């Protein structure tokens, strides 16, 4: 099972402070573990802070976007999920059209017309060790669904949890993850 380019959707009763009601975009999943970016948890960092550090202007299309808190790991670093893949340093190709890049050069080029079509900027990332995500899935902590670029880039972050559930055709209020456990 490879969940790269999928969303993890936290079950409604997840009690973890960070992951409660999270949607995580899985960027890499292999035998060594998984890496993803939470796409619906805003951070205290602003787009202005990100772009002023590079000396570039915020692109008009991103002025109202929020910087996401991608996860609890390496929160001092920035990560960008973007289209198209491009030729950036420190990139992981997630799909034919989407990459995760952790190098500053992608931020510096976002304001250039045509360099990056769509981008989700985050600080930190989410990580699972070998077998950890599979155990959490077996414990009914998460649902999975193939990723949707519209949810990832176009829907406001506060609506992404409901939109991911809607992609499954499920009302999150009707779920109880303890089903089947005595």
Swiss-Prot record:
InterPro entries: AlgH-like (IPR003774)
Highest taxon, organism lineage: Bacteria
A cellular component term, taken from the record's GO annotations: cytosol
One Pfam family cited in the UniProt record for this chain: DUF179
Family of this protein: Belongs to the UPF0301 (AlgH) family.
Protein name: UPF0301 protein NMB1336
Organism encoding this protein: Neisseria meningitidis serogroup B (strain ATCC BAA-335 / MC58)
């Amino acid at each position: 099972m490879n969940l790269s380019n999928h969303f993890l959707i936290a079950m409604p009763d997840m009690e973890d402070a960070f992951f409660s009601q999270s949607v995580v975009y899985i960027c890499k999943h292999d035998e060594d573990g998984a890496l993803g970016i939470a796409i619906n948890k805003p951070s205290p960092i602003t787009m202005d802070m990100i772009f002023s550090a590079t000396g570039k202007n915020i692109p008009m299309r991103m002025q109202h976007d929020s910087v996401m808190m991608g996860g609890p790991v390496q929160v001092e670093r920035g990560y960008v999920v973007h289209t198209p893949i491009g030729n950036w340093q420190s990139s992981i190709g997630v799909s034919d059209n989407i990459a995760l890049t952790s190098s500053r050069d992608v931020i510096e080029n976002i304001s250039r017309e045509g360099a990056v079509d769509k981008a989700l900027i985050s600080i930190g990332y989410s990580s699972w060790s070998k077998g950890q995500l599979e155990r959490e899935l077996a414990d009914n902590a998460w649902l999975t669904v193939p990723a949707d670029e519209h949810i990832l880039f176009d829907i406001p972050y506060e609506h992404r949890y409901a939109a991911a559930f809607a992609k499954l055709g499920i009302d999150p209020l009707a779920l109880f993850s303890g089903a089947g456990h005595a």
